[in-house]
Curated annotation (Swiss-Prot):
It is an enzyme of class 1 (oxidoreductase). NCBIfam families: DAP-DH (TIGR01921). This is Meso-diaminopimelate D-dehydrogenase. InterPro entries: Diaminopimelate_DH_Ddh, Gfo/Idh/MocA-like_OxRdtase_N, Meso-DAP_DH_C, NAD(P)-bd_dom_sf. Pathway: Amino-acid biosynthesis; L-lysine biosynthesis via DAP pathway; DL-2,6-diaminopimelate from (S)-tetrahydrodipicolinate: step 1/1. One of its GO terms (molecular function) is diaminopimelate dehydrogenase activity. It comes from the Bacteria. It comes from Bacteroides fragilis (strain ATCC 25285 / DSM 2151 / CCUG 4856 / JCM 11019 / LMG 10263 / NCTC 9343 / Onslow / VPI 2553 / EN-2). Its EC number is 1.4.1.16. Induction: Is expressed at a very high level and is reciprocally regulated with dapL and dapF. Substrate binds at residues 92, 122, 146, 152-153, 171, 181, 227, 253. One of its GO terms (biological process) is diaminopimelate biosynthetic process.
Amino acid sequence: MKKVRAAIVGYGNIGRYVLEALQAAPDFEIAGVVRRAGAENKPAELNDYAVVKDIKELQGVDVAILCTPTRSVEKYAKEILAMGINTVDSFDIHTGIVDLRRELGACAKEHGAVSIISAGWDPGSDSIVRTMLEAIAPKGITYTNFGPGMSMGHTVAVKAIDGVKAALSMTIPTGTGIHRRMVYIELKDGYKFEEVAAAIKSDAYFVNDETHVKQVPSVDALLDMGHGVNLTRKGVSGKTQNQLFEFNMRINNPALTAQVLVCVARASMKQQPGCYTMVEVPVIDLLPGDREEWIGHLV
């Protein structure tokens, strides 16, 4: 079996877990890791791998797994797709997904590559669950309640705001798909808390939610990467009312995001050039090995 050569682009929380997921996958080999510092002061777990500053320094890359902040995804994806290399990412600004799909779709088709976007657990695997529930109960209401837990995307967004030394953004469900954002920050010297808090609340990640910003002496003392979701739908199948569905999970956020990214990296090798979200990709393409064996096992 020819293995898929994957490059990890970005080596923060998600990148570290992508490394573990690739090491555990029977059909992948790690082409290398791209990080801003290159091989300088590289962590011990990367000693066996090529560590570079630019993906152009790696050989024979089939797919790049983007573990960068969401707001950097489009830039990196376009550069890599233009090289004819597939990309996958966990872009998580829901309102920007349609536009990103259009932008990367044109680039991917031009260069004969595949991009699968917004492939974390939400958006991502939860999107598949929502799609299935809507199909089997076409009329009704779905509520997605996140947490309580640490939001990776929101935390990264806070860290990027001027004056923030360290940050943790917690998502607290209040019910019926409405959430409260609890943001804990350490402040850099010379900045006013009120001004930094206002900048956080006006960011696109927070502007539509009830958001509370708290200054703390140590973010590390609060840190827990656990998260979860409760997803429910109450609707109608045919003409029959009161069909109720519920999906729950409690997870380590970056570990699950990483596993989903590796699954869609595999699936990217089976699609025609273009840009896809997870609801457009056959779920069986997420799995390694023989398709008929999976059909016999799962169906």
